[in-house]
């Protein structure tokens, strides 16, 4: 990054400050009582404003030609032209209507409310609802209150257990742009390669930002690439940090009280607690502010497996246990059973077999008659699970996987500040640091599996994936007016690191020398963005505004290798196994199966996968918005971007709003958009242990510049290109306290990037196939997968939002209803490379499972109905959310029923929709202290169970591949809120 030009321009702007004035005043109600927390915004300047203190007083820097907008919940908003006034006393009149929120997203002109916006924008007052909301992190909050938003906690999905993929309008997590205070937020370093929603994508980790630091969230439900750049195909989410003054705190504790807790043994699990503190103060005497938020939280695991009903122990395991009782470890008598077994081993096995009291005489006779280890091997594979469990004092639930939310421990610290350097200019800064430690489980390694070295783990083990996620960001800039121009120059830096440590596991090829934890490496992503935005009103038609700007973005992506023992396979001498090593050098179990290398559950990043890649992006954009008349608004935006790694893109957007009546608007928009392949998708390479057709396999994800991709004919990634259309209307009836909006949309995305299914090791002997075999063997994988611009998709749907507010003498009632109906479909032919098509592998390139993950694993229909009632010191909140049906990705039974289970015409299990009820009651002991008791999922509902053939021996009782409302059941919580001063 070249900081010198940026700092020079910053200094130039500071010393080129235009003269203006400081306006002071007071806001009161119609009873002459001061109003605390009134929002005061400069209509012409997005993000510039102030709030009143406990005396109703405020101070703000403005120009004489600007307009102030005063707004407060339960009162009519008021606009006042500044002129030459130095002091103001503003009286707000109460009215039963919704607070008019001035939007940051959707238009650079500023000063628009969501009812007057030419595109649909939802505004969620996080600060207002934090007292009564059951949810505490952003993903959970948005999943509950925003029908077009979907995100649930993932289970047994490697890193996805620690980062919840989030989707808007059914599109990918990487097709929604996230802003913080109007500035582009960096994405996570993690890329989801498991078989869960959002597979193959990179999203923004919303949970690095504490919800207590936010005043509101704006969700722009429309394509906006022409305004904001890459990723804004589905829309834009803008998170606004608090500017409050004073000290407030919140303490929450809750957990899951449900009969399914603790693997269906009941009681309570998944306890979680959170402490939030926010402090704000004035900065200077001209309306500056400084606001801090600290948040700390812990979350325990939930356990939702059933009872493992598969095989666990065979006869060899039983004999091995009896030998261990005598201090004799049978694994010490061989390292490769086929070449170096100690001659004593046969005699020892026969001897200890006699101590297994449940072996009948006939079976013992078979063992005693064996003349070699080869004779014993088929005999000792016999299952004796029930008998051996009883002998060892274990039960089947001891072999359950950890199926449920991961545990975590985290902290966040965020700051938001602005300081006027004159009456007309201010410098600002915001950002934060967060840390999150998480622990999740993988697939259980049972004693009768080759993946388990029973010399160290005679009872098997449950490996754990732990992550250390560190995230930091800082944005700083200067903004103000130079004449009629509003300028905003900023620099935003963000960095995310995702580090893996694998615990309670082993590298089986190391046998007795294996540690039980491994440094598996880390992923890093950093992004630096420099923006210069300019806008000004112009005298054209009724009212017009022109905006333009430039942006330079630098991105860096790194893979850091893990320790050698986290990924290497070792031979019988303890050295790294050469690629050309004969079978006689490989470490085996008793039955002759080669013991796999690398940390079980998740091998580390290999040395040859380590890399650091960078790219630069340059952009220029312009936007023109005009009220042609008082009833007709038009907006046009264009954007050009150049990427150093794949080329150029040009996009546009047109939008209009027609005011039929003072509070009745029609709106429509058309745009093109794009999403550049993330730098992660371009260069990520790693090996994961995935379940494929019910079998655990090491699967390599190879990037598109690899030799393997070239041999398979996988083409280099290009940008996704989109076209969007939307139309709708917005109606507001102030005297009835009612507002309504409905919007229909259509989005086509060409060249959607997906992660292919896994290709198996070639069996032929052509030169290309022989080379691929070497690549497979060198990476120690049995299957490989790639990223590819594989398909074109179309998404269409409708959003409806209805809000009603009723204020009476003794109570206030707010009602909100919203629903989203959406459908995503693959259209046209699959973009299959010639080599793959010629080999008949098109189903592996984009499978039926891939189609369902793209189209149907999240609900197509979602609706919420909420009520918020305040009576005196009491506040009650009731919300019902309907999560529509979803479809499991696995093909099981075509178009029929199996008991209570329903399947569609293609054989996928249908997960039917359900209504989830949330209820909370709060009591305000004083104006500054309240206590809330609440229940999320009041009636303890769960998704439909997996059909038996698809529940992995009763481990995945509920699908882990679909995303409705999670699988944790009823959640109860208690929350105390304090406004100290």
Predicted segments, located by residue:
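Extracytoplasmic beta-strand/coil segments of soluble accessory domains associated
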Residues: 59, 139-189
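C-terminal beta-signal and adjacent terminal beta-strands/loops
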Residues: 188, 748-749, 823-826, 882-897, ...
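Surface-exposed extracellular loop regions of Gram-negative outer-membrane beta-barrel proteins
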Residues: 241-263, 379-390, 398-399, 404, ...
């Amino acid at each position: 990054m070249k900081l010198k030009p940026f700092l020079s321009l910053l200094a130039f702007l500071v010393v080129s400050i235009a003269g203006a004035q400081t306006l002071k005043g007071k806001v009161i109600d119609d009873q002459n009582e001061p109003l605390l927390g009134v929002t005061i915004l400069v209509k012409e300047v997005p993000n510039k404003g102030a709030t009143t203190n406990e005396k109703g007083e405020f101070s703000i820097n403005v120009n004489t030609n600007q307009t102030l907008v005063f707004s407060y919940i339960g009162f009519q908003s008021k606009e006042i032209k500044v002129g030459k006034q130095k002091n103001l006393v503003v009286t707000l009149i109460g009215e039963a209507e919704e607070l008019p929120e001035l939007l940051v997203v959707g238009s650079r002109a500023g000063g628009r409310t969501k009812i007057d916006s030419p595109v649909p924008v939802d505004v969620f007052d996080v600060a207002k609802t934090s007292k009564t909301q059951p949810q505490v992190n952003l993903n959970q909050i948005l999943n509950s209150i925003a029908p077009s938003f979907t995100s649930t906690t993932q289970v047994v999905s490697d890193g996805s257990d620690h980062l919840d993929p989030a989707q808007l309008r059914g599109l990918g997590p990487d097709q929604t742009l996230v802003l913080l205070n109007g500035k582009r937020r960096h994405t996570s370093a993690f890329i989801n390669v498991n078989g869960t929603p959002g597979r193959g994508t990179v999203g923004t980790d919303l949970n690095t930002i504490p919800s207590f630091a936010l005043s509101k969230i704006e969700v722009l439900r429309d394509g906006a690439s022409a305004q904001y750049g890459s990723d804004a195909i589905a829309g834009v989410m803008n998170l606004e940090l608090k500017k409050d003054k004073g000290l407030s705190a919140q303490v929450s504790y809750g957990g899951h009280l449900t009969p399914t807790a603790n693997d269906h043994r009941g009681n309570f699990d998944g306890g979680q607690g959170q402490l939030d503190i926010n402090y704000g103060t004035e900065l200077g005497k001209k309306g500056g502010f400084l606001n801090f938020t600290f948040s700390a939280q812990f979350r325990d695991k939930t356990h939702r497996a059933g009872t493992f009903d598969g095989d666990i122990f065979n006869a060899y395991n039983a004999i091995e246990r009896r030998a261990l009782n005598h201090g004799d470890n049978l694994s010490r008598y061989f390292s490769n059973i086929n070449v170096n077994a100690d001659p004593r081993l046969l005699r020892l096995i026969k001897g200890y077999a006699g101590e297994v009291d449940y072996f009948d005489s006939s079976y013992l006779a078979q063992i005693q008659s064996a003349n070699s280890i080869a004779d014993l091997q088929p005999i000792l594979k016999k299952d004796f699970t029930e008998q051996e469990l009883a002998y060892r004092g274990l039960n089947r639930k001891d072999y359950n996987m950890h199926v449920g939310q991961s545990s975590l421990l985290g902290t966040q610290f965020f700051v938001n500040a602005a300081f006027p350097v004159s009456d007309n200019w201010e410098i600002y800064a915001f950002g934060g640091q967060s840390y999150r430690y998480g622990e999740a489980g993988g697939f259980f390694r049972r004693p009768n599996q080759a993946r388990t070295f029973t010399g160290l783990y005679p009872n098997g083990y449950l490996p754990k994936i732990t992550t250390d996620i560190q995230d930091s960001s800082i944005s700083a800039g200067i903004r103000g007016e130079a004449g009629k121009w509003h300028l905003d120059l900023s620099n935003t830096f963000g960095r995310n690191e995702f580090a893996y440590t694998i615990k309670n596991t082993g590298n089986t090829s190391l046998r007795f020398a294996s540690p039980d934890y491994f440094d598996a490496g880390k992923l890093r992503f950093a992004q630096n963005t420099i923006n210069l935005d300019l806008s000004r009103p112009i005298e054209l038609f009724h009212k017009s505004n022109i905006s333009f700007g430039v942006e330079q973005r630098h991105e860096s992506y790194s893979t850091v290798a893990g320790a050698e023992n986290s990924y290497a396979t070792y031979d019988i001498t303890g050295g790294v196994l050469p690629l050309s090593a004969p079978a006689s050098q490989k470490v085996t179990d008793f039955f002759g199966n080669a013991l796999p290398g690398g940390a079980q559950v998740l091998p580390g990043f290999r040395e040859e996968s380590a890399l650091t890649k960078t790219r630069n992006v340059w952009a220029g954009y312009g936007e023109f918005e005009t009220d042609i008349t008082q009833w007709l608004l038009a907006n046009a935006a264009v954007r050009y971007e150049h990427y150093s790694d794949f080329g150029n893109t040009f996009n546009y957007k047109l939008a209009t709003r027609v005011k039929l009546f003072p509070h009745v608007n029609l709106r429509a928009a058309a745009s093109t958009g794009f999403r550049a392949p993330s730098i992660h998708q371009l260069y990520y390479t790693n090996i994961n242990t995935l379940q494929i057709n019910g079998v655990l396999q090491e699967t390599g994800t190879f990037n598109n510049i690899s030799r393997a991709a070239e041999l398979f004919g996988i083409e280099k990634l290009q940008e996704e290109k989109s076209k969007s259309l939307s139309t709708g209307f917005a109606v507001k009836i102030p005297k009835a306290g009612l507002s309504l909006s409905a919007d229909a949309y259509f989005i086509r995305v060409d060249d959607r990037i997906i992660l292919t299914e896994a290709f198996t090791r070639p069996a032929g002997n052509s030169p290309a196939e022989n080379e691929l075999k070497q690549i497979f063997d060198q990476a120690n994988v049995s299957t490989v997968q790639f990223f590819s611009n594989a398909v074109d998709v179309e998404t269409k749907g409708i959003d409806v939002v209805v809000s009603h507010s009723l204020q009476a003498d003794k109570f206030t009632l707010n009602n909100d209803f919203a629903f989203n109906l959406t459908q995503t479909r693959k259209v046209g032919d699959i973009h299959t490379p010639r080599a793959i098509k010629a080999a008949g592998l098109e189903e592996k390139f984009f499978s039926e499972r891939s189609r369902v993950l793209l189209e149907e694993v999240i609900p197509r229909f979602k609706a919420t109905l909420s009520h918020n009632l305040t009576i005196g010191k009491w506040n009650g909140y009731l919300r019902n959310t309907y999560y529509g049906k979803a479809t499991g990705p696995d093909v099981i039974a075509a178009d029929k029923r199996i008991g209570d289970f329903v399947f569609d015409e293609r054989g996928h299990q249908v997960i039917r929709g359900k209504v989830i009820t949330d209820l909370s009651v709060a009591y305000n002991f004083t104006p500054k202290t309240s206590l809330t008791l609440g229940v999320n999922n009041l009636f303890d509902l769960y998704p439909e169970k997996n059909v038996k053939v698809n529940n992995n021996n009763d481990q995945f009782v509920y699908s882990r591949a679909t995303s409705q409302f999670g699988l944790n059941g009823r959640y109860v919580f208690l929350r105390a809120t304090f406004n100290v001063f």
